[in-house]
Amino acid sequence: MTELTQLASWQALALHSKTVPHMRELFKQQPQRFDDMSTKACGLLLDYSKNRASTETLSLLFALAKESKLEEKIKAMFAGSTINNTEQRAVLHTALRAPKDKVIDVEGVNIVAEVQQTLDKMEGFVGSVTTGDWKGYTGKTITDVVSIGIGGSFLGPKIVSQALRPYWTGQLNCHFVANVDGTSIIEKLKGLNAETTLFVMSSKSFGTQETLTNTLSAKDWFLAQGATQSDVAKHFVAVSSNVAKATEFGIDANNIFPMWDWVGGRYSLWSAIGLPIALLVGMDNFRELLAGAHEMDNHFLETPLESNMPVIMGMFSLWYGNFFNAQSHVVLTYDHYLRGLPAYFQQLDMESNGKSVTLNGTDVDYSTGPVIWGGEGTNGQHAYHQLLHQGTALIPADFIMPLNSHNPIGEHHVQLASNCFGQTQALMQGRTFDEALAELSTSSLPDSEKQLIAQHKVMPGNKPSNTLLMDKLTPTTLGALIALYEHRTFVQGAIWQINSFDQWGVELGKQLGNDVLDRLTAQADATDLDTSSNALINLFRQNKI
């Protein structure tokens, strides 16, 4: 047994998990359950009443958090302690949205001052592009932005830009490129005019394979349209810490925005990585995004565990993964603008908590990060919701919906809400055999067939869900929502005693990909790897099967 599983609270939860009643019974026992098990913070309301949890469950979960020293770990992250122990780094994405007067010291430097300088630089740049002062090489204003990145430098800007579509200023269009598949960038460049296109390249090292390959192809396209090398500076900017490589590429040093080691890619949209967002919605809205996240930071840092929204969500996820063998978690967004959030949260959670070794190098003997997946309502109801209702796997769900739509036409939004709330009720309540049979009472079917069909219409219920509501989707509420999931991810990793801020599996994939690339471009067939890899490489070299 590991240190975690030996904790008294862990062992108490293991015993308690076998005695929790069906949620139908819990709602009968606790008529005021919604009032007792919902909380508001930062413009969000969390209803967690539809969980397999009694008051005793909550007490035990918070006891585990306290026994795991969660509060101390939260404070250590905010203080800039080196909690990323495998890379010897602080973890300070929270500093990216801290107010100007905040002081956070990293190796003798107040990083908040550096962040504010970068935000001011972004503001000047965004203003020059959106007002038309920034001119392309033929004197025309910029109309299109192509954002080139991968991972966090792609997903964050893309999903936030998509979510904030109602706040676009209208001066620019933005196109996001990540995949190294040439089709991706070719399709994005179709119809663009090199004279009015600005490229934003995001890579800390200015050497990430996918990002550099796509940027070089973008540059080739740009030059092929009649531009020259000296024109590159008017159409390419970078977010990178490698100024030398960026300037060698042709980017003006004044148009290189910094990145820092204390920010991981999946937590970086709040930095200059978010430049495409700012170009689309303006710096005022970008700062509102930061303000919403900062408000959630304060809530996470200062609120007691029992009413702390990220803690509640993180502990429930752990509850199902470790004591009910839940292997996945679904995020369901009932707002079209938020349709990309499940993919963003997927990277955030799975890259952070997809670990099997504790901070001190011990193999874990408990489940860690679940598979995160999902989509937008109501589309999912006609696809995978069937599995949620009647499948054999337990899949906890998060439902996310604004109470007010940006596009309130006809009965659309009330129907959307009815589906959202109806799904949470159906998952919790289910349908018994007697209820299903009663529904068939007026049918002319023979009794034997009614019995058969009723059996197929039974739904066990007791399927847990959280519901997150906001008055309206705004930059502020979006910032708070994303920060909520960041901190929820931290809570789980802190309890599991893993490092949520490295990604060695990703690094191995890069390394082996480069090894294979060498063999794909070699003069002779591959013979030195396993037989499967050798065969696949050689088939590719032959261009046929």
Swiss-Prot record:
GO MF term list: carbohydrate derivative binding; glucose-6-phosphate isomerase activity; monosaccharide binding
Keyword Secreted listed: no
Name assigned to this protein: Glucose-6-phosphate isomerase
Active-site residues annotated for this sequence: 351, 382, 510
CDD domains membership: SIS_PGI_1 (cd05015), SIS_PGI_2 (cd05016)
Keyword vocabulary terms for this entry: Cytoplasm, Gluconeogenesis, Glycolysis, Isomerase
Top-level taxon: Bacteria
E.C. number(s) listed in UniProt: 5.3.1.9
Gene coding for it: pgi
Record's catalysed reaction(s): alpha-D-glucose 6-phosphate = beta-D-fructose 6-phosphate
Lineage, opening ranks: Bacteria, Pseudomonadati, Pseudomonadota, Gammaproteobacteria, Alteromonadales
GO cellular component annotations of the record: cytosol
Family per record: Belongs to the GPI family.
Keyword Transferase: no
Subcellular compartments: Cytoplasm
Role this protein plays: Catalyzes the reversible isomerization of glucose-6-phosphate to fructose-6-phosphate.
Major site of localization recorded for this protein: cytoplasm
